[in-house]
């Protein structure tokens, strides 16, 4: 098994583009958002030109509702640039289908609240039952501009599990499973058994001896409660979030929970960070597509990777955590009217998500 940590969208794309071009049998890509801007066009052209006999692109239907972090059926629709981007996206979908690339929008939108919020947040690519990509990067210009990362893993065994996962999602029947491959624990959450699926992460937090370091823009309840519980045991807890958070209520919630729970908050100064990772005692790395938030905990389809692979943990610490920490500044962690209001808003959202959660399914 060969594992590479790819930091930044360009580093990720350079590797994935080559793997996609070299695929001969299967080329599967799953993403939360796909937009017809320059980044989306790059992916579309690469999939169109790929030699693989079975090429498929699976996009969550979130992309039919949101573009560039703006709601399409709303005031933003008056923006000519947004309308053009939506039309370009539709045009690329038609082109790809015309060139023999399967394109599907998963989890169709519907009028019920469950049909609106139940999304697949996975970011996955699998090529020739050999190479797997997992992580947090979506295919749009603004996502590529964010600070983020992906894993590239060469492993036929992991690729077999990832292919199984992709095909199940493609058929509208996402699976939940927990697999161990070469020191990587690969957990797939299907939006039904998520609380059970997250249990290994919660147990690891509860077993922490001296440190838990989290990078997430959208960290929220109940994970903030788990971190506060660890802090009460004397574990040092640090949360690194972006200086420019595109979801302000979540930033306020993090500050309020930190003020109450006694953990440290630091701000990444380089714009928006979309990183999502946790290290426990600098020995265990948890990463994937989950933001460690209430939507992941209750509703979203996600991937979680847990590993004690020393080379990978060190690569993450050396390439992400340590440099980001060195450039970050400590936030003044204190409760205020603003942080309390943000905290209330997030907790109301978490309660709503809990009520909308589907019955627990099988988790194996």
Report the location of each language-model feature.
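Short, contiguous pre-domain boundary segments
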Residues: 1-2, 328
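HKD-type phospholipase D/PLD-like phosphodiesterase module
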Residues: 2-25, 33-206, 210, 240-283, ...
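Short phosphate-engaging motifs
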Residues: 12, 158, 223, 312-313
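Beta-propeller domains
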Residues: 191, 202, 216, 220-224, ...
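Catalytic cores of glycan-processing enzymes that make or break glycosidic bonds
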Residues: 198, 235, 362
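Helical hairpin unit composed of two closely spaced alpha helices linked by a short loop
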Residues: 229-230, 235
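Long, C-terminal catalytic modules of enzymes
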Residues: 283-285, 290-364
């Amino acid at each position: 098994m060969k594992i590479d940590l790819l930091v930044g969208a360009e580093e990720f794309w350079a590797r994935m583009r080559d793997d996609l071009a070299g695929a001969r049998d299967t080329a599967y890509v799953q993403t939360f958002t796909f937009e017809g801007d320059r980044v989306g066009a790059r992916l579309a052209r690469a999939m169109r030109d790929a030699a693989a006999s079975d090429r498929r692109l699976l996009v969550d239907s979130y992309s039919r509702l949101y573009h560039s972090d703006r709601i399409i059926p709303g005031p933003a629709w008056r923006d000519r640039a947004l309308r053009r981007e939506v039309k370009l996206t539709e045009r690329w979908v038609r082109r790809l289908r015309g060139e023999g690339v399967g394109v599907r929008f998963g989890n169709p939108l519907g009028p019920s609240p469950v049909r609106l919020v139940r999304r697949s947040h996975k970011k996955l690519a699998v090529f020739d039952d050999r190479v797997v990509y997992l992580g947090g990067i979506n295919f749009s210009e603004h996502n590529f501009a964010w600070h983020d990362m992906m894993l590239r893993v060469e492993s036929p065994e992991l690729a077999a599990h990832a292919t199984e996962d992709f095909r199940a999602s493609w058929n509208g029947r996402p699976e939940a499973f927990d697999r161990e491959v070469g020191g990587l624990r690969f957990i797939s959450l299907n939006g039904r058994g998520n609380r059970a699926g997250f249990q290994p992460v919660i147990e690891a937090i509860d077993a922490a001896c001296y440190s838990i370091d989290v990078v997430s823009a959208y960290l929220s309840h109940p994970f903030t409660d788990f971190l506060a519980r660890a802090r009460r045991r004397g574990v040092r807890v640090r949360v690194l979030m972006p200086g420019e958070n595109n979801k302000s209520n979540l930033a306020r919630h993090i500050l309020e929970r930190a003020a109450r729970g006694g953990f440290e908050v630091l701000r990444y100064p380089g714009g928006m960070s979309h990183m999502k990772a946790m290290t426990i005692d600098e020995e265990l790395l948890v990463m994937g597509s989950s933001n460690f938030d209430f939507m992941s905990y209750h509703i979203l389809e996600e991937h979680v990777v847990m590993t004690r692979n020393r080379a990978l943990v060190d690569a993450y610490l050396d390439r992400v955590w340590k440099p980001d920490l060195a450039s970050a500044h400590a936030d003044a962690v204190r409760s205020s009217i603003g942080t309390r209001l943000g905290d209330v808003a997030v907790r109301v959202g978490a309660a709503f998500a809990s009520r909308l959660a589907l019955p627990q399914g099988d988790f194996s």
